[in-house]
Amino acid sequence: MRMNDHQDSESFTYERTWHEIEDMLDRAERKQNMHYTKMQKAIKSERIYHMRNYKALEGVVKALRWVLGDKNIDHPLE
């Protein structure tokens, strides 16, 4: 897979519903909250794991909010 395969429209179905996207956002936020809670209570080695996953999900949440038109998200990559 090339880095710019997103330009290949045959790879995308564009069939996701708003409900599916909202559900994914809800799941991502719940998972992010779980990692945040565990990060607060964990020993250092485990805290790093939860911190890394929390930060990764931060990007997922921001991108999904942008897709849904959140007025507070100007651009998902900033």
Task: Write out the residue ranges for each language-model feature.
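Short, charge-rich amphipathic interface segments used for partner binding and complex assembly
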Residues: 34-78
